Amino acid sequence: DPNRDWGWGWQPNYIQNGAYKYPFSLPENRAIMEFVMKHPNIAAAQSYHNAGGMILRGPGGQEDVNTYNAQDVAVYDAIAKKGEELIPGYKYLVVYKDLYSAYGGELDWFYAGRGIYTYSNELWTPYLMFMREGTRDPFDNKTYDFDRYLLFQDAFVPWKEYDHPQYGKIEVGGFKKNFGRAHPGFLLESDAHRNMAFTIYHCYHTPKLKISEVKERDLGDGLKEITATVANERLMPTHSSQDVKNKIEVPDYITINTTAKVLAGIQVENADLNQTTEQKNNPQTIAVPNIPGLGTITVKWIVQGNAPYTVTVNSKKGGVASSK
């Protein structure tokens, strides 16, 4: 099973059915892993499976629950709840809690291993047959009716007698093996479009940074204080909690480019209470561990001189933005 081959929480086949030789022993998975490792700007990922009508997130095992903090869960929830609206009949679920324990899964490697917000979409759901939930009623003929009235019996092979060399007289027939696992043709385009729309919505909420405000204050004696506020206009932070905790990616850097002398670089934690932290080394470029989704970070510099300047933020996942 390619989805039991990823290098997080991997277990051998006698524990996790479907596991192969070792993590990333399948060349296709290894190629994806190597691509992701070479592209630290990747902030979001989705993979498509079948079937079940689900939008899944990790963790696959209960032991990894603590890899997700409340802020990350809030991001996952907000995006996936919109997915439930965009794709009727799909349910947002957590693998270990709502399905079963799964080890070596793609979801876990992307998020826990790389700090990337990731979903798996389980394509196709019986809800799409008649736009209503299924039941466990043994007399519910929804599947039969769907084949009869909408597929014109294309999914069902009539039973017929067959002379089996070992078992003698038997009957063969019934529903085709792909029925219930993949979309009938006329429903494929619609569901593919809706899943694509959800993927684009997910992508839209990857970090987008801008310098929202720059202001100056004269301190006298040729000194001035320059304060810059960097805003993230999307739901995802520049670093997930797993990323920050394990220092997976480098910090975001906010730099003042000027010929004036930069005497101090300071991160503002609470402007109202005047709580700040000075960066002792290289004050011109302030390293911040994370810029929160739909939030801001404020920094300031003490500068000697009156030269022009440009403020730039450089983030692996949030891109580059500047203001003069």
What are these regions (language model features)?
Residues E122, T229-A231, T255, K300-I302, ...:
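Residue-level recognition of well-ordered beta-strand positions that form the cores
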Residues V230-K245:
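Short amphipathic, basic-aromatic surface patches that mediate peripheral association
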Residues Q284-K324:
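Low-complexity, intrinsically disordered segments enriched in Ser/Thr together with acidic residues
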Residues L223, L235-P237, V320-S322:
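Non-catalytic terminal regions with compositionally biased, polar/charged low complexity
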